[in-house]
Amino acid sequence: MDNTRTAGAPPTRRRPLTLALGSGALAALLVTTALATGAGAGEPSGPGPGTQAVPRHAVTGYWHNFDNGSVIQRLADVPDDFDIIAVSFADSTTVPGEIEFNLDPVLGYTSEQQFKDEIAAKQAAGTSVIISVGGELGNVTVNDPASAQAFTTSTLALMDEYGFDGVDIDLEHGINATYLTQAMEGIHAATGDSLVYTMAPQTIDMQSTSSQYFQLALNTKDFLTVVNTQYYNSGTMLGCDGQVYAAGSVDFLTALACIQLESGLDPSQVGLGVPASPNAAGSGYVSPQTVTDALDCLTQGTNCGTFVPDRTYPDLRGAMTWSTNWDAHSGYAWSSVVGPHVHALP
């Protein structure tokens, strides 16, 4: 996902409030215990900020904390068709595994509190707002116990400070499934099942269960909300039938999603990630109608291309787009079609 910024004032940098969860000693003990023993180490601390459940069929959209020439969009202006908004992106620090968030002044907020109030308003309307980590330019390294703990602690701190409902993993420069699993287990142990936890791997990352991303998804499937694979900016890939498919078609979406659906993930944990407009990705754009056809094919066995799944998956979670800003740039041509269709799935 392209988070290249246009020239302008840099966002104000601020260290994450790593002890914002309460007593510093208590927060450190919680994280250390969770990382050492996993999510079952103790009782969760209770519901997170949003507490509302993600709908059975949901639409995820990435929101730009930067200006890349699409549309500068306030969080409040994201359409209600989106059930999960992934704020893009958190920033890395000099501490391995640690993240922080720096609101870009180009967005025009008069204060950070105004931004936080818009998060709360979205949540009050039933939308989950999460912090996304990674993107094309973002690189957060979690590859040992110390960096795993730093990721857990700093993510929980951002959730506490801004009210985020959870976290999205969009790391595109390689991950270590072992230690990122530990980090996510620590976050889940602290927040409980109110956590909204999404992933946006690239197509190559979900071709085989032996890949690090697929392993992370399977390791954390007990609390994973949805994997929205990016079915764009991709070369040809194998489908679950062993045939080769090219991006930009209904078959690419359905045949590749079938791999996840038949390899251990629950259908409710699988979503279709696509660009909102031709400008939003270098390649792989499909029309909103193609997205709805793919959804119908996988959930009901209708409107398929040449690939027809052996069975249907009525609980398929839905669709994702990069991004709400590019959607706005195209007059909401994507969300106005895909959103109602997802929400009307049986």
Specify the residue positions occupied by each region the protein language model found.
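A ubiquitous, low-specificity "background" feature that marks scattered single residues
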Residues: 8-14, 33, 108-110, 176, ...
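Chitinase-like catalytic core of GlcNAc-active glycosidases
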Residues: 45-271, 276-293, 310-316, 326-338, ...
